[in-house]
Amino acid sequence: MKALLDLFKQVTAEEEFDAITIGLASPDKIRSWSYGEVKKPETINYRTFKPERDGLFCAKIFGPIKDYECLCGKYKRLKHRGVICEKCGVEVTLAKVRRDRMGHIELASPTAHIWFLKSLPSRLGMVLDMTLRDIERVLYFEAYVVTDPGMVSNLQRAQLLTEDQYLEMVEEHGDEFQALMGAEGIRELLRNLELDSEVESLHAELEVTGSEAKNKKLAKRLKILEGFQKSGIKPDWMILEVLPVLPPDLRPLVPLDGGRFATSDLNDLYRRVINRNNRLKRLLELKAPEIIVRNEKRMLQESVDSLLDNGRRGKAMTGANKRPLKSLADMIKGKGGRFRQNLLGKRVDYSGRSVIVVGPQLKLHQCGLPKLMALELFKPFIFHKLEVLGYATTIKQAKKMVEGQEPVVWDILEDVIREHPVMLNRAPTLHRLGIQAFEPTLIEGKAIQLHPLVCAAFNADFDGDQMAVHVPLSLEAQMEARTLMLASNNVLSPANGQPIIVPSQDIVLGLYYATREKINGKGEGMYFADTAEIERAMAAGQLDVHSRISVRLKQYEPAAVDGEWEEKTVRVETTAGRALLAKILPKGLPFKAIDRALKKKEISKLIDESFRRCGLKETVIFADKLMQNGYALATRAGISFCSDDMLVPAKKYEIISSAEAEVKEIETQYTNGLVTQGERYNKVVDIWGRTGDQVAKVMMEELGHEEVIDRHGKKVKQDSFNSIYMMADSGARGSAAQIRQLAGMRGLMAKPDGSIIETPITTNFREGLNVLQYFISTHGARKGLADTALKTANSGYLTRRLVDVTQDLVITEDDCGTKNGFVVKALVEGGEVIEALRERILGRVTVDDLIDPETQETVIFAGTMLDEDLVDLIDKLGIDEVKVRTPLTCDTRYGLCAQCYGRDLGRGTMVNAGEAVGVIAAQSIGEPGTQLTMRTFHVGGAASRAAVADKVEGKSAGTVRYTSNMRYVTSAKGEKVVISRSGEVLIVDDHGRERERHKVPYGAMLSVDEDKSVKAGAKLATWDPHTRPIITEYAGTVRFENVEEGVTVAKQVDDVTGLSTLVVIDHKRGGKAAVKGVRPVVKLLDESGQEVRVHGSDHTVSIAFQVGSIISVVDGQQVGVGDVLARMPQESAKTRDITGGLPRVAELFEARTPKDASVLAEVTGTISFGKDTKGKQRLVITDLEGNVHEFLISKDKHVLVHDGQVVNKGEKIVEGEPDPHDILRLQGIEALARYITDEVQDVYRLQGVKINDKHIEVIVRQMLRRVTIVEPGDTKFIKSEQVERAELLAENDRANAEGKIPATIEHMLLGITKASLSTDSFISAASFQETTRVLTEAAIMGKRDELRGLKENVIVGRLIPAGTGLAFHRSRKAQLAGEDIAASRQIEEATAENTTQEADQGL
């Protein structure tokens, strides 16, 4: 009996492990795994269906086919366990050993492993320092390789010889030297490789070499050789002498009916290898001619190649039906491979799926579960209960009862599911709210009922969506589901900390309708004692729900003494509907919170307010009541609409005709040659865009207001009760833009390529479209549908990359103790506060004490988390910048600390240790991805708005200031013309605090003087939006140089107008090739005919024209200061489509260098222009020490600086998108983080999506997690190696402790794909992308995966180190160390540092 118990123990004993290493297997290792050699290609006997002996399914090698039964049937049953049958040689044991017993094939000739040969860069090539082409020639028997030159002087090791050269050498030198062909040759070379001496010589070479390319090559080779050294793997193991054979149950052969077999492709591939191997053995025994043997060896090499990775070299081997066979490599890579299909995504038991329907009667924490589903899902629980209660004696009997659906079973089912939460999931699960737990209530029917308020989180609707149910089984699982996942515990969205349980659609409409006010409604001005009286009056038909009345309401205020609620009765003047709603307000929310027309935004604020003031429980109850009331009220209101509700404004037609007149006027200007084709198009589009908005405005005026007569007989305006208007105004359905299409004018349409068609649709859907208008409409609409399909896939891929890069980021400690942080200000653009300071710092932890600017005393201490009240205080004190902690400056080695992260947005409290903040960040950014557009349409979007700004107006009153880089000249007319590119106008208040700032472009006219006070709405500057002028800062007579027709300028005659203009052309297209590097310039002469010089220098003034500019002056003309010399039509800059939406976000996170990247100043210094070379202009910056830095910039780029300007390091000097890598290099991490955060937020803000900055910062932290070694000092690194930040810090700590020189580094920015692939964990990287490459590299280096991230742990099937798993692993490690759990923290921290040290000393 004891033996039996031991058996069960041995099966279930699970090994605890903390890391996994991967390496190359030596031939002996492979033989030691094997249970016997597979000698024959046969599989099973087609008559007896028994496996052939020594074949691919041989029972002697791999184990019995039936449990405890040998093949010939001599031994059966358990009592013979472990006996080996003497007749058939099969061991009597469990049949499942066929899943893990391996065999082997002894190869008659060694074979190279294709992964190490062909996966780029070729590892074999790097180790031997030979090219891949050469190695292949040797392997596939086209050339000999010298393995031992012996005494022959003109031969080197690893030199290639052709057949003829070899024969010549043999004739000459006989057997003094050795040269081999095929894998044997390569194996010899690898065997003779002296690793230690090679590594030393490489180190020596690295010291002396100068060239960058050589350096890189040597470093790569050194890294591989050191990898072999460290891991103790011999290089010649990359050549296979023994091939392992996969256990047969992992490559099954299944008989189908009709005598055919379904087989795994691997069996075919193995059969080919065995056939060729056996043939080769026979040929060798027969001493066949060399050429035949060679051919056979080559074929063997090819068949082994296809077995390992089919199609990697040459044509893929195909089966009978012409499709490529699936090799071992294909089994593990890609979406259907082992990693993503079986390890990261598994199907689970105890789950079901069904269609969802709405369940408005449910409480927030409930869902309706069909009885039949529940019966099936909770079967084991029911069986148990039936036994315990004595209804059934055996499980079998219980099963019968359940299947027969006896009445008692239903009572027990009710009992079992009480308080047992189930998890509901709707695919695609884009963020953590896509799986939530509910308490099931049993319902008839077959559809799952879902609470309406959680639809937003699941992104569910009831048009046929399906959802899956999962049952948490263990008590711990139930507890976690209940405390963490219950729908009522997830009121806030983890992406932005705002409520996600928000009423929408009908509920909003009902609440809005009930809280609207109607002038002179029935019963207006009545007085009521309490709400019950109101209800009676309404039931009697004496009172309208919208009427203004007075009523006594109970209000609750916290008592001064004990903080209990005190009840007060106050008389309030309000509407009947609002008074009735007051009944459901939780204590702690004042009545004024609902004393207004409740729109969707207001209701969201209301729930937020309730959460902050009254806590979670009250809020959930309140939300449920709001929902029930909203539905009831919407039903009672009976709002519907018809075509008469779409009121077309009478003024529409005159607005349109005036616009048509304007367009005609511009057409006339165009025919007279005053504007160019491009300007005309821009202006026309602007006019129609404006007109559309005007019509919409007039329409909303008419639709949204109605005149009524009040009690005193006066005419007054009030918000209209038009159904369409109410739906849009409340935020229930529809928007102003949609109403505009119904009753205004449809406006401008876009073509599929995003450009705007200049003829707008002047009619609306109410009036109907004609054929042309309908056709123009379909144009853009179809594009929208095509985009949606692409968008979903792209968005999913972005999310996958984001999750992969951040999956191992977990909160691991409370405080890392850093004193660093970022200074945060309000985000201001174009004078508008886009994001207030309070929103950006809410939930962050302060770095410094905050001081009241008035009294200079500390109001908030360092290390405080800023909650709503503190943020209000900061607002009140007028503090305009705060230094806060951020994930980017956190000093925690593996993971993040709670203080740097701040508030957990989904819970509203400080983040807990073990929270997987990385994954949450990735989900928060990825989830709204589907809402982002693929390409930005410029219709009514921000793009078309920004293009036509032609003035700046102050929003607030104050004093005008200019920034230091604002330069202007005063023209003869007294106008101040701006000649700086990046000047800004500020308005400051009386305390000198900046209220707003506006960028002023080059060539603008300033309308205000510095230090003058202005009123709100004052015009600050104006400019022409459609052209960019070139302005002179000096007066004089114009003299053209290099202005030659057909060479540098072209006369352009407009077909329509017949007028000619001089346009600067690219001289490359001019006829003469002799005049390279000349550009048209204007020199200015003074009265005496001398060239005018730049003030304070002897440079002459020369103003160069850019390609494409239209010259406005003629030779010899007198010009004054601030005059325009030429203008550059703006449309040329406008045609470059702004990358928007999803592709823009992906581009930022992938850290791609933009197409037309701008150039940033490398140093702080003074600008000058050097000699031009062909097609390039030379820009020179002289820094403060007098060192010169040159940039070559192509002529068509727009330079933002001018001669003599002083620029700061990192400032833009050429127009374009900045390259994030440059920002990091020149301005550091903070500037980079700010750039990426702002740019990503711009895209999301355009779509109205809110995401907290810290999520983006978390991703940027992961993009910065690797560093480049600049000087290795006394560390183990080599120069320009890339290493993980944590590894570097540990190594530097060690160097410092030993008093050695630590390494110096520079930060590097990796795109998210690169960052995921370069993670320390090879398991995580392999399951992401490029599986082959990752695994080959890891195997050679003998890498060790510490299983720190979440993904690795899911793959190996352990509890993930996040949440409760973090505590579990910590306590487990502490117990292993023989310590009590209290000491586990010190151990955890110490081990993180020690592991790297031990690894180093162990070498």
From Swiss-Prot:
Disulphide-bridged cysteine pairs: none
Subunit structure: The RNAP catalytic core consists of 2 alpha, 1 beta, 1 beta' and 1 omega subunit. When a sigma factor is associated with the core the holoenzyme is formed, which can initiate transcription.
Protein name as catalogued: DNA-directed RNA polymerase subunit beta'
Record-linked InterPro entries: DNA-dir_RpoC_beta_prime, DNA-dir_RpoC_beta_prime_bact, RNA_pol_asu, RNA_pol_N, RNA_pol_Rpb1_1, RNA_pol_Rpb1_3, RNA_pol_Rpb1_3_sf, RNA_pol_Rpb1_4
Residues engaged in binding Zn(2+) 1: C70, C72, C85, C88
One protein family per Pfam: RNA_pol_Rpb1_3
Protein residues bound to Mg(2+): D461, D463, D465
Binding site for Zn(2+) 2: C816, C890, C897, C900
Cofactor remark from the record: Binds 1 Mg(2+) ion per subunit.
Keyword hit for Metal-binding: yes
GO biological process assignments: DNA-templated transcription
Enzyme class: transferase
Keywords, comma-separated and alphabetical: DNA-directed RNA polymerase, Magnesium, Metal-binding, Nucleotidyltransferase, Transcription, Transferase, Zinc
Organism the protein comes from: Dechloromonas aromatica (strain RCB)
EC nos: 2.7.7.6
The family this protein is said to belong to: Belongs to the RNA polymerase beta' chain family.
Catalytic activity: RNA(n) + a ribonucleoside 5'-triphosphate = RNA(n+1) + diphosphate
Purpose: DNA-dependent RNA polymerase catalyzes the transcription of DNA into RNA using the four ribonucleoside triphosphates as substrates.
Protein's gene: rpoC
GO terms for MF: DNA binding; DNA-directed RNA polymerase activity; magnesium ion binding; zinc ion binding
Cofactor dependency: Mg(2+); Zn(2+)
A cellular-component GO term for this protein: DNA-directed RNA polymerase complex
